[in-house]
UniProtKB/Swiss-Prot annotation:
This is Putative NrdI-like protein. Belongs to the NrdI family. One of its GO terms (biological process) is protein modification process. NCBIfam families: PRK02551.1 (NF002714). Signal peptide: none annotated. InterPro entries: Flavoprotein-like_sf, RNR_NrdI. It comes from Streptococcus pyogenes serotype M18 (strain MGAS8232). Pfam families: Flavodoxin_NdrI (PF07972).
Amino acid sequence: MTDLTLIFISLSGNTLSFVRRLSQYLAEKHHIQTKTINIKELHHETFPVMESFVAILPTYLEGGNGIDSGKVEILTNPLGDFIAAHDNVKHCLGIIGSGNKNFNHQYCLTAKQYAKRFGFPMLGDFELRGTNADIERLAQVIVARLTADQQS
């Protein structure tokens, strides 16, 4: 059995719902046990993470369109601080973004910014709470990434 940590921040409950369902799916279908860390519950505390993890980040940005304005992250910054602290970034397999497609260019923009900032891949995205198809699709991506990481 393989272990994986999912590090995320959930403000409205959508990301938490997705993480719970993804964890259950990974356990049942791929025999991967997950440990979850909701950064919101840490109250800006950081600590070293020594195992491989996937970051999951909802999109909260200042107003705007994501092109000319509205590119500045709000509310979810503690996840970036956690990844940057203690060289945790070296254990991150990649990031999954979530958002609302009604926001067009801002959809999952924060996750794309993290991928560029930290140099890890954007593994995928889902809208709002995600669908069962999103769970299956992203689980496959995670399994492939975890397998590649373990073989290197």
